[in-house]
Design a protein with these regions (language model features):
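Substrate-binding/catalytic subdomain of NAD(P)-dependent oxidoreductase enzymes
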Residues: 86-89, 115, 176, 192-196, ...
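Small/polar-residue-rich loop-to-helix segments that shape phosphate-bearing ligand pockets
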Residues: 2-80, 148-173
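Glycine-rich beta-alpha junction loops
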Residues: 58-60, 88-92, 119-126, 159, ...
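Short glycine/serine/threonine-rich phosphate/pyrophosphate-binding segments
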Residues: 1, 11-15, 63, 90-98, ...
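Active-site/ligand-binding loops adjacent to catalytic centers
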Residues: 17, 35-50, 103-114, 118-205, ...
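Catalytic phosphate/nucleotide-handling subdomain of diverse soluble enzymes
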Residues: 214-270
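Glycine-rich ThDP/TPP pyrophosphate-binding loop and its adjacent helix/strand module
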Residues: 62-99, 106-108
Length: 270
């Protein structure tokens, strides 16, 4: 069985081409909550008998799966990219790309350099950006209520993790320091403009998080932060949703129960 936790306001993100097996269930945190609240709910559930956490960034298999984008790009290009661009919520994908790069160095056939990890967040929800710009390994204080408001005001809500694996050993901070990386902050307007430009040029729509990454690449080019002849990998983490949904019946998962953000273990157990 699979139990998913998600903020109630983001249930529209769970869409499918056909109904799922009833072994898949969803519970949600009430409207106004954010992904951290949903993650916290999931953590409480995993304290109950019979439930095990997927593991997030600490799940090696998950990181290795995410690393296939770097593996695919590098083997196709024939060399390690000079820059790796991605929008981040937890930063797990960027960590995975860095780890894949280190394996390529051991392999030796694709170059002896590290791709600079260039990541981005969606303003006003930019806690990792703020920490990086302050040259701080530790995340800066972020009021919970303000964080929830900020998280619900961005177009790329999947990027709104309040407790990402940024500070831990081997986390995003280390990946960026090791590669001379950089952090970008992108407004909703910049993301929407970049998404439209991508669709015009490439012929396919992209998801908001991918649009944030695209906007960060535009920023880097405009600010001369990448060379004109650089080999750049832009990780488009999702796209084609608009095209896929055309003339199709789409099914949405509905929560079996919605919990308050301060629900305790006994409430959830019931």
């Amino acid at each position: 069985k699979l139990l998913l936790t998600i903020p109630e306001d983001n249930l529209s993100a769970l869409w499918f081409e056909k109904p799922l097996n009833p072994c898949v269930k969803v519970i949600a945190t009430k409207s106004g909550s954010d992904y951290f609240d949903a993650i916290n709910l999931g953590n409480i559930v995993c304290e109950l008998d019979g439930f095990f956490a997927e593991g997030g960034a600490k799940n090696i298999a998950r990181r290795d799966g995410m690393a296939t984008t770097m593996l695919s790009a590098t083997t196709f290009i024939g060399r390690i990219p000079d820059y790796y661009f991605q929008a981040v919520g937890s930063g797990t994908g960027a960590i995975a790309a860095w780890e894949a790069n280190l394996r390529f160095l051991e392999d030796g056939r694709y170059g002896n350099h590290k791709a600079k990890i260039y990541v981005s967040q969606n303003r006003p929800f930019v806690p990792m950006y703020d920490a990086w710009k302050a040259d701080s390994r530790e995340m800066l204080p972020y009021d919970n209520d303000k964080a929830r408001v900020d998280a619900n005001s961005v177009v790329a809500k999947v990027l709104t993790n309040r407790k990402p694996p940024y500070s831990i050993n081997g986390g995003l901070y280390d990946a960026m320091k090791d590669t001379d990386g950089e952090f970008f902050a992108v407004t909703n307007e910049e993301a929407e403009k970049a998404g439209k430009l991508f669709e015009e040029l490439e012929g396919i729509d992209i998801n908001p998080a991918a649009a944030v990454a695209t906007a960060s690449l535009i920023q880097a080019i405009e600010n001369n932060q990448v060379e004109r002849d650089a080999v750049i990998m832009l990780n488009i983490t999702g796209g084609g949703e608009k095209r896929f949904k055309e003339n199709k019946d789409i099914f949405y998962l509905q929560p079996t129960r919605v919990f308050a953000v301060d629900a305790d273990k006994e409430d959830i157990k019931e």
